[in-house]
């Protein structure tokens, strides 16, 4: 399963599944390097609100996902606890990322079409579990708050 992401001119990031909008994030920058993001599903339902100050970490300030999520963020690594038994870890290796669900690699993220004006990403999932794809895409979205902003 491939999910494609595009950073648009209005600073939003849209993720497409089968060429249809799957998840999108609007972003606002504030003075001093703060970035606020709101993540929505294809039905325009607000799923998460996040804020960050430069690369010091991401804080989830609102969630509407049906299960509690907590996170720990570092510069190259993000870890999310989903409910009581699952965890998602995102390892950022410069322009490539790898997603781990309960210590098993479920996806690689890489930039594509580097010669185009906007940044294009591709998440290559090696799982068919729709819930893992859904939650992983939403939480990966929180880690790209700064993509193409500076």
Give the location of each predicted region.
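Intrinsically disordered, low-complexity proline/glycine-rich segments
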Residues: 1-150
């Amino acid at each position: 399963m491939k999910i494609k992401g595009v950073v648009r001119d209005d600073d939003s990031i849209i993720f497409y599944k089968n060429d249809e909008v799957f998840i999108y994030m609007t972003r606002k920058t504030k003075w001093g390097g703060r970035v606020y993001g709101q993540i929505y599903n294809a039905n325009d339902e607000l799923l998460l609100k996040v804020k960050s100050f430069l690369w010091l970490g991401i804080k989830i300030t609102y969630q509407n996902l049906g299960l509690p999520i907590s996170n720990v963020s570092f510069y190259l690594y993000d870890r999310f606890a989903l409910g009581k038994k699952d965890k998602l870890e995102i390892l950022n290796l410069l322009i490539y990322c790898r997603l781990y669900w309960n210590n098993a690699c479920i996806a690689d993220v890489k930039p594509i079409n580097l010669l185009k004006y906007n940044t294009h990403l591709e998440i290559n999932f090696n799982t068919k579990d729709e819930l893992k794809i859904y939650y992983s895409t939403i939480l990966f979205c929180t880690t790209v708050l700064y993509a193409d902003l500076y």
